[in-house]
Amino acid sequence: MSQILSASSRLKPVNLHGADSETCTMVFKNHWNQVQRILESHDPFKNTQAKYRSISADEVSAVQNYVEHMLMLLIEEEVTDAAMGPILEYVVSENIMEKLFLWSLRREFTDETKYEQLKMYELLVTQSHQPLLHHKPILKPLMMLLSACSGTSTAVVETKLAVLLNQLCSILAKDPSILELFFHTSEDQGAANFLIFSLLIPFIHREGTVGQQARDALLFIMSLSAENNVVAKHIVEGTFFCPVLATGLSGLYSSLPTKLDDKGEDWHCLLKEDCLQIPELIQFQNSLEFCNAVIQVAHPLIRAQLVDYIFNGFLLPVVAPALHKVTVEEVMTTTAYLDLFLRSVSEPTLLKIFLRFILIHQHEKVHILDTLVSRINTPFRLCVVSLALFRTLIGLHCEDVMLQLILRYLIPCNHVMVTQRSAVREQDCYSACAEKFLSLTPECCALTVSSTGYLERRQTMYSKFRQRTDSDDSKHLYEKDTLMDGDCAEPVDDNYLEYLWEAHENILNCLEDCKVWSAPYDGQNPDPEISLKALMEDNCRRGEFPTFRRATRHYMDSFSSETPSLGGKTLLDLEWDDSYDTGMSPDSGSCSPQPSIDAVLPPEPPHHIQEMKRNAIMFIKGSYIEESDFQDDVMVYRLCAVKDAKDADMQNITDKNDIETNDQFTKPQEGNQTQANYNKNANLNEDTVKTQVKQTLPKVKIQLSPAADDISNMNTLSPDSEEFIARYDDMLNGLKTSTLEDVISPIHSLASPMEEDEDEFDKYSLDLPQAESIPSPFGPRDATIFSNFLPRPQTAPFTGPFISVVLSKLENMLENSLHVNLLLIGIITQLATYPQPLIRSFLLNTNIVFQPSVRSLYQVLASVKQKIEQLAATQQNFPVLLVEAQRYLLCRMDMPNQSADTFTKDNIAANTERKPAAAAAEAPRGVVQKAKEHRANPLLPLSGESKHIQNAMLAAALFPEFLKELAALAQEHSVLHSFHH
Amino acid sequence: MNPFWNMSSAAVRKRSDNDEKIATGDQKISPPRSSSAKKQLPSIPKNAVPITKPISPSPSVQPTNGTHASYGPFYLEYSLLAEFTLVVKQKLPGVYVQPSYRSALMWFGVIFIRHGLYQDGVFKFTVYIPDNYPDGECPRLVFDVPVFHPLVDPVSGELDVKRAFTKWRRNHNHIWQVLMYARRIFYKIDTTSPLNPEAAVLYEKDVQLFKSKVVDSVKLCNSHLFDQPKIEDPYAIIFSPWNPVLHDDARERMLAQKKSEEQSKGLHVSGLSWVKPGSVLPFSKEENSLQT
């Protein structure tokens, strides 16, 4: 080692500028002669004694000294024209470098020797005044050295190797003409291979500077490959670059912690500072970012291969199972990781496979998207983490995301009254919708706190507007200026201008991003009729009916919200995975005119879902509950049978169905086990039973043959069969209320023994209002009346699981914790920013008339308003508590925005400067953490008796702000629409 | 008080006579659709409608609380902004408007007449919008120089807008229609119940004399083109003679901007979409970049 150190210290450039070229060459040749003498004395070909003589230390150091000096001379040699300098020419013609390499091989080829040699080449390559790598006598020994180093394991050598490789690659990047040489020097040893590249691959996932150097070096080559088909082809066909990169991700992922430390109550996504605390995560992120960078610069062939490997080698085998782990905790962690990855990836090609994975991949026959949506409805932290993931997804402004999440349910326009179709495109010329949103402000919330920062903020807003006016030609902006000159803003308007400003910016951003979308989504394009067909075919292929789910779910949603729930009851909303049990699983497609085998025999809910449910229940109750506690499902089957029998009578379909129902009654196994499975955990109430009843409905129609569970049956009834639809409608119409009551009333009597049966689970479910709220399980009958206007199959209008779960969650605003509400508000305002008339009209047009079974945002907000007013009427010192809550929120707002780095992408990061509702939605994190740190801070603590009241008060304080945001968005849409084409 | 509100009332001169007797061309401009379309919907079954949602929105919702009322200026402002965007969208040939700096209720405009009797006429005008828009009367349009025309008041220069919009109906009538009407009177001359009887009579009886009077009027208007604007306002429309130093450059920039916009189209891709046009399925777009 001392040798190495001395070597590097002595190799300081000597000032040779004084010496003339001729002298230098003389000195060089002289030195070489000295060296050569020593070399030859040990060369077995030239000296027969050589093999018996050992190399003395003196000889070694003599050679070393000469060589060092020679290298200095070579490095310092300068030439004016393109020709080689005399020293270089001598080096090349005498093949000096190769001879030196062989000499070092002849000695013991230790790590120290390797280090020396690597160092020597590094100096040559980086310091030399003339290009050296073009010359094979220099390149070849270098290659030999590199390949000799490939198996090495010493950290010192590895570091040096990485540095040299990095240097070589950067030279390559600057001078691609050398590439050819690099490629073919090794041809002598066999197949063409790209040695520097292969040597770099093992370092890809290395941590620390070595890994960084190697990755940088690889990026040089990647950008080279973009221009060079040969290199690209070689990398794709001749190296394991892509597989190593992708499977490396899997390896690194598996070392990530499966559970995260408790990060505080309102933690919902991984921020930069979270990542920094987990070294494994840093390493993973490095590799992911490297993949991103490779995809950014590499040749399309490499890009395609890498993306393919990441999909098939990382997402499918690793992330998918991780998303379906057994414990809520693990699933939550995976969701948070996935969210982080989505935010870290910026290359569209890479993002695309992540989105493809989330949007259309199925795990155990269930779409990952559906699973993720259903998790919003859990009472755990998993809910907020899932919401955060969706916030990220929606913030991408990606057409495919919006299509799967929302638009596919809106395109058929089933959600609007037929006469209102054209209203989808209508603009709200006179701010009528904004007015309606604002009119939902509960009177009890009208008073506002004046905060100290308020005046300043207003000032900055004003100046911002003014600046904008000067610089921007958009015609209308100065009018805002006018408005402000008027100083007409009363206290209540204080931040409304900010909301308008932000809405303006956000809509413009979104408009810009949506320019690449394939269609305007205005209710005409894509054509509702044609698209409906395409979507139905797709659904068929997917084996489910997401477009036409039952309306019942909406009623369930409204039930839970209509529950007067502020009476201090336990409010554990254990609506676990409703969507799985009712709305989302394929068997719920019973409203669909498309019969399928799935409608007959619901598939087993995926194993992990059942597992999770069980876990969830344990979690909630803090103790394990025997599964058998939920096994009493015979009753349900009896009900199904009764119902089936009734239906059978109605339809005059006799024997076969009897057999079928008997079958079902007596042999509740296999497929029926599923029903058992979801009933055992579901709240056993009318809804569930209705679900059952409803699910049995299609059987009457479909099970024309006992072999109904035969797949082939699927084809016997065409989805578009007019006759089938007609009969289906008839049947629906035939089921008047009386029939329903007949069906439902026995449920009560049957259900009562169940309640006595120590079904503890019931205690955790919500008390549902009994008589008044029993809706027709088939959706309002009138829907079928309207259906007569439709030239196509009428289906229960359904705006999709996502909308429905988000709105139902929103309706429970007063029971939600602050961060759930902030996320919900964030998501809804993000959605309301989209300029597509279908989305805009659904969320913001308060005048449009929807189908009765469709619940609109306005209706949900109206219900929240009502609840707030109820609260105000019953809650003592409501005004005091409200002011406190407002102060609390203002405090959060004034805190420095710690999570500006939450979003790594520009389009989202642009929105960091925000105000009350939105600001908190983005940056809820730091605030409560700070609140914990400074418990003494007199402003922060809320004095509500319970967490429950505190949440309600915070929601009440947020609500008016949310309304302002929506109103502002509605107003800006009316002005900005013309920019959208 | 807010000048936003005062401005218009100060600027608008009251007109005493309303020509309500005149039948209008209203119908052609905006075919009367039933304004109560929403009410004619099939009645929604009671059990399906949440209590909170009003079944039919009443046209003039009275603000129920104080909070609500203070947003009035915003609603008016945005209504006018929306109107303005509609005007921009219409791209009426030869018609240009610009809201004033001081009030969104006052718009400056100019009409270029490119053929017909009034060919080469450049008529500046001002539009005054009532402050209870859109529930008030129709906007007024006053030419800076009274044009010789049967429907233009020879003294005040005001155009008879009312005959086209007997009653201003929100959602059906828009300001761009007023502007379109103002343009049309120069191409299709109507002489019934004129504000300028002389012009009307001449047009009926002696077209030649009418024509020459029109030519004089156009000349007069054009001679006042470079006058200072009648109403002093930073956004008033001002004409000045062509100044190569100033205008050549500006003109070039305007043309260049248009070109560069066209060029940059398609190059700048910031959004995300893998949906094939015409498809409603995600990731339906073929990846053609791979086959390079």
Swiss-Prot record, chain B:
Disulfide bond sites: none
Entry membrane topology: Peripheral membrane protein
Domain of life according to the entry: Eukaryota
Localisation per UniProt entry: Cytoplasm; Cell membrane
Keywords associated with the record: Apoptosis, Cell membrane, Cytoplasm, Membrane, Protein transport, Transport
Segments for region (Disordered): 1-64, 273-292
Cellular component annotations (GO), alphabetically ordered: FHF complex; plasma membrane
Compositionally biased intervals (Basic and acidic residues): 14-23
Domain UBC core: 75-223
Main location: cytoplasm
Protein's GO biological process: apoptotic process; early endosome to late endosome transport; endosome organization; endosome to lysosome transport; lysosome organization; protein transport
InterPro entries assigned: Ub_conjugating_enzyme, UBQ-conjugat_E2_core, UBQ-conjugating_enzyme/RWD
PANTHER family: UBIQUITIN-CONJUGATING ENZYME E2
Family designation: Belongs to the ubiquitin-conjugating enzyme family. FTS subfamily.
Functional description taken from the UniProt entry: May function to promote vesicle trafficking and/or fusion. May also regulate apoptosis.
Record-given protein name: AKT-interacting protein
